[in-house]
Amino acid sequence: MGGEEIVWHLTGRIRLDRSPGGTGGVLLDTTSATICSANESAMDLLDILRNGADSHSLVDKLTSDYQVSLRRAVADVDQFLHQLKSLRLVDGQD
């Protein structure tokens, strides 16, 4: 995390559905039929990514809303974005 931050957006074909209790949900890629279950913190990050966010904003969300150290939040966000990119569920732009 340094220099120019990439702003990540969920691709337009993504649908998010939270569980009734709000403790998680599912992500559906309506083109490939990929379905991913997500816990509460992942759903919070996915909600932010709908409108676009850089990794710093995602880290801030984890450290402010969950008892997560900065080091852990950075690692978790890096891994989270890597997974989303590998499934082609996010697009990034400078």
Question: What are the residue ranges of the model-derived segments?
Answer:
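Acidic, low-complexity/disordered tracts enriched in E/D and polar residues
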Residues: 1-43
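Long, charge-rich, low-complexity alpha-helical segments
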Residues: 31-94
